[in-house]
């Protein structure tokens, strides 16, 4: 009997089971203990294979692939700390709804807690963050193949969002020629190998029913808050709100076209909040709101009803409103709850939104990060997509820009970390094959710098804008102690990215004005390669411009 041969047959069942649940992309890091899984993945023609040497980046690459494909994405890593590096991506997926399947190779039980090399306690290491966790036994023919495949099917068949952790211990030897060991064990699955359906099929979950009193509520004064959603949903939500005559407050990730732009500015005006107090119902479609003023208003508003519609399960309202948590696909929910044509009831807010945008436009000429945020829609590639980083840059775009309705926008706004942003953007581009504009800050770029290796492999032009304001300038917006701000919060690194781009053989530009930036873009969109554009700005200009605009708009 060959241990290595049976390890591979056991792994082949696992990998084949994944294909029955829509897994096409599989991300693989190098490792020895994961050899059975890696070889099984390599031999399965259903998979598109992605590789990376950094497990943390690999997890975020999978996250980006899942964001676009809307299908589960598998990750294979070896044992030890390689597994722990998947934690950030797993946490983000749990909060934003992407499906990740983490196949973590492990030492067999007799090598745990005895000083064996690269052997840690992996079962349960992700605590409550996976939707499902499976600790498989050491491969053995004493366990029927139908148990293995049905165990995988149960976890994936009931997976609506988040991650599944499948821990896979393998004993040595891990290498060797294939023989007939375990062939009959594998063949007991019969024609399942030729089929394309799961061995075990479970009924999908029930979604929220139609709200029978909707015809009553749609005649009231309402407000629509649009959070993270798809491009298709964004266009539908915009039309739905317009028909109802309700003001739409659109987040940067809503893809609604933000018909009332600069919401994070005008929500700081007392006239706007006073008018919003007249709302009898607030319907929030999608979660992960960005703007500080929006979150402050959302926390303080007291309508008769507050409904939150999102296909992610769980509580999504940090303000704990009285109302309804409706678990449903947004587009499907809109069809069940049609709008009735009514006249807009808000008067002040459209005027304030227009005046706020004019105030932003009046400042657009200076070469700075706030102005870039406002102009970002001018640089979007046709038939492309936008990936927005975290920290200050996403807040500036949310507050100062107006993105086109239905234009795809992606971000990691679940846990809102700055780790893995470049890797996620790489996954977004690979899954879509579209021209991609990604924008991050200098610390975010440094944090995931080795992901530039992933950006060497793109199928369409990708432009990475690094806004270099020399540190974490978002802390300039917070009441951090002035005496300790630079050392303990901003942490300026005084670096530039020309040599990093050169090391990975990526094109690089460092424009000094808008004309040079436009020339760099024109050059970048011509070829299916990655271009790094470093925009060096004065440290605090972006934060100061936002604060000045907030003060100006609050007094309109």
Curated annotation (Swiss-Prot):
Pfam families, alphabetized: TPP_enzyme_C, TPP_enzyme_M_2, TPP_enzyme_N
Catalyzed reactions per annotation: isochorismate + 2-oxoglutarate + H(+) = 5-enolpyruvoyl-6-hydroxy-2-succinyl-cyclohex-3-ene-1-carboxylate + CO2
Molecular function terms from GO: 2-succinyl-5-enolpyruvyl-6-hydroxy-3-cyclohexene-1-carboxylic-acid synthase activity; magnesium ion binding; manganese ion binding; thiamine pyrophosphate binding
Co-factor requirement: Mg(2+); Mn(2+); thiamine diphosphate
Cytoplasm recorded as keyword: no
Keywords for the protein's UniProt record, in alphabetical order: Magnesium, Manganese, Menaquinone biosynthesis, Metal-binding, Thiamine pyrophosphate, Transferase
BP terms from Gene Ontology: menaquinone biosynthetic process
Pathway where this protein functions: Quinol/quinone metabolism; 1,4-dihydroxy-2-naphthoate biosynthesis; 1,4-dihydroxy-2-naphthoate from chorismate: step 2/7; Quinol/quinone metabolism; menaquinone biosynthesis
Function: Catalyzes the thiamine diphosphate-dependent decarboxylation of 2-oxoglutarate and the subsequent addition of the resulting succinic semialdehyde-thiamine pyrophosphate anion to isochorismate to yield 2-succinyl-5-enolpyruvyl-6-hydroxy-3-cyclohexene-1-carboxylate (SEPHCHC).
PANTHER family, per database record: 2-SUCCINYL-5-ENOLPYRUVYL-6-HYDROXY-3-CYCLOHEXENE-1-CARBOXYLATE SYNTHASE, PROTEIN PHYLLO, CHLOROPLASTIC
HAMAP family documented for this protein: MenD
Annotated family: Belongs to the TPP enzyme family. MenD subfamily.
Subunit structure: Homodimer.
Protein name: 2-succinyl-5-enolpyruvyl-6-hydroxy-3-cyclohexene-1-carboxylate synthase
Source organism per UniProt: Escherichia coli O139:H28 (strain E24377A / ETEC)
Gene designation per UniProt: menD
């Amino acid at each position: 009997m060959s241990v290595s041969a049976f390890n591979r047959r056991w792994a082949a069942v696992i990998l084949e089971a994944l294909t029955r649940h829509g897994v096409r992309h599989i991300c693989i890091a190098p490792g020895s203990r994961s050899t059975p899984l890696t070889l099984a993945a390599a031999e399965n023609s259903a998979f598109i294979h992605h590789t990376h040497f950094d497990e943390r980046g690999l997890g975020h690459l999978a996250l980006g692939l899942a964001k676009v494909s809307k299908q589960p994405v598998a990750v294979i890593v070896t044992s030890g700390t390689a597994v722990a590096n998947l934690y950030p991506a797993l946490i983000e997926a749990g909060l934003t709804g992407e499906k990740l399947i983490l196949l973590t190779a492990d030492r067999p039980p007799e090598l745990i807690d005895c000083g064996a090399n690269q052997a840690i306690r992996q079962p349960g290491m992700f605590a409550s963050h996976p939707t499902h966790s499976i600790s498989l036994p050491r491969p053995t023919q004493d366990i029927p193949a139908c148990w293995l495949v049905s165990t995988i099917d149960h976890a994936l068949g009931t997976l609506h969002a988040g991650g599944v952790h499948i821990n896979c211990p393998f004993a040595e030897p891990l290498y060797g020629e294939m023989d007939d060991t375990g062939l009959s064990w594998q063949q007991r699955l019969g024609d399942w190998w030729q089929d394309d359906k799961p061995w075990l099929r479970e009924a999908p979950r029930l979604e929220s029913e139609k709200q029978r009193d909707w015809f009553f509520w749609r005649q009231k004064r309402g407000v629509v808050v649009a959070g993270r959603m798809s491009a298709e949903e964004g266009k539908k939500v915009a039309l739905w709100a317009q028909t109802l005559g309700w003001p739409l407050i659109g987040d940067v990730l809503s893809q609604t076209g933000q018909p009332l732009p600069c919401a994070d500015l005008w929500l700081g005006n007392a006239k706007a909040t006073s008018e919003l107090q007249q709302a009898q119902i607030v319907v929030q479609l999608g979660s992960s709101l960005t703007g500080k003023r929006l979150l402050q208003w959302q926390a303080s508003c007291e309508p008769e009803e507050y409904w939150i519609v999102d296909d992610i399960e769980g509580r999504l309202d940090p303000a704990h409103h009285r109302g309804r948590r409706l678990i449903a696909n947004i587009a499907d929910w809109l069809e069940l709850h049609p709008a009735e044509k009514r006249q807009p009831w808000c008067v002040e807010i459209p005027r304030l939104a227009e005046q706020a945008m004019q105030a932003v436009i009046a400042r657009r000429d200076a070469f700075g990060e706030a102005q870039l945020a406002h102009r970002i829609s001018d640089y979007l590639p046709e038939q492309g997509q936008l990936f927005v980083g975290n920290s200050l840059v996403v807040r500036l775009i949310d507050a100062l820009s107006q993105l086109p309705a239905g234009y795809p926008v992606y971000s990691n706004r679940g846990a809102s970390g700055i780790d893995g942003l470049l890797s996620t953007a790489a996954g977004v581009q690979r899954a879509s094959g579209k021209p991609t504009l990604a924008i991050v800050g200098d610390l975010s770029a440094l944090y995931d710098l080795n992901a530039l290796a992933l950006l060497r492999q793109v199928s369409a032009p990708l432009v990475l804008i690094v806004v270099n304001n020399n540190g974490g300038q978002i802390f300039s917006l917070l009441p951090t102690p002035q005496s300790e701000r630079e050392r303990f919060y901003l942490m300026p690194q005084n670096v530039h990215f020309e040599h990093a781009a050169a090391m990975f053989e990526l094109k690089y530009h460092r424009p000094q004005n808008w004309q040079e930036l436009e020339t760099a873009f024109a050059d970048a969109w011509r070829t299916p390669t990655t271009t790094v554009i470093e925009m060096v700005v004065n440290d605090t200009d972006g934060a100061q411009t936002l604060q000045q605009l907030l003060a100006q708009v609050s007094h309109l």
